[in-house]
Amino acid sequence: MLPGEHDQPPVSIGGMATRLVQINMKAHDDAKLGGFWAEALGWAVSSEGPGVTNLEPEGFVYPDPDPVAVCVDLVVSAEPKTAKNRVHLDLATTSKDHQAELVERLTGLGATPIDIGQGDVPWKVMADPEGNEFCVLDWHDPVADTGPIATVVVDCADPRAMARFWGEATDWTVHRVTDQNAVLRSAQGVGPYLQFLRTPDPKTVWNRVHLDLRPYPGDERDAEAARLRALGATAIDLGDSDIPWTVLADPEGNEFCLLAPG
C-alpha cells in the first residue's frame, strides 16, 4: 500500500519543474458530488465558475505552496461512467474505531460498499454517489502528515516505467519502486502519496479522474509541456486553443493537465 520501514531510501530525480496540485474529477452534478467530497474530507467548497466545484482545506489560498493541500476539482460532464476508474483516492484513518466511524459516516452521506474483487483486505472499498471508487485505508498504514487523502492511486501496467516518468515530470521524491507498485511523495515529506499500482485491466476510456500539474512561478507552460513530451508524454488536441492549460497523456495514456505556472 504505502511506504513502510523496509522501503528503499527516498530518491530524488533531478530536472523537475512541476508539482501535483489537484485531482480533477468529472461529475454529472458537480455541486452535489462536491458536497459529498467536502463532507468526506472536511474541506471548504468554492466555485471558479458554472459547472465547476472546487474543494480545498479551510483557509487555503490557491496556489498554496503547502504540499498537504492536493485539492479536488469537480467538473460537470454528461459522459456516463462505463468502466472502473484508473485513478482513485485512499482516505486516511488513525485507528480501528476511526476507520469504522468514517465508513459509517460516508455511508450516511451516500457512499456504498462495493466489491471489485479485492477479497479479504483490511481496507474498505467504496463508491461515492456517482459510482467513483475510493478506499478507506487500514489504520495500520503509515499515513502521518498526509491530510485526509492518504494516497492518490493510479492503475498502470508498468510501475517502474511510471516511476521514471512521473519522478522526472514532477519534483516529487520516489520512495518505492517494485514490479507491483511505485510510490512518490512531495519532497517536503508531507501530503498524500502518489502510488502507481500494477493492474491487469487495460485502459479503455478517457479517465474520469485525472491529475493536474502546475509549473512553478517563472517557468513557462509551453516549455514545460515540451519537457514532458521529451520524457514520454503525448499531446492531446482538444481543438480549443483558448483553454489556459495543456492536455497531455503519460506513457500509458493517462490524461493529465498542465496548468498555468503559479
Predicted regions and their residues:
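Short, small/polar residue-rich loop motifs at catalytic or cofactor-binding pockets
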Residues: 119-121, 241-243
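Glyoxalase I/VOC metalloenzyme domain signal
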Residues: 7-50, 56-115, 127-178, 184-239, ...
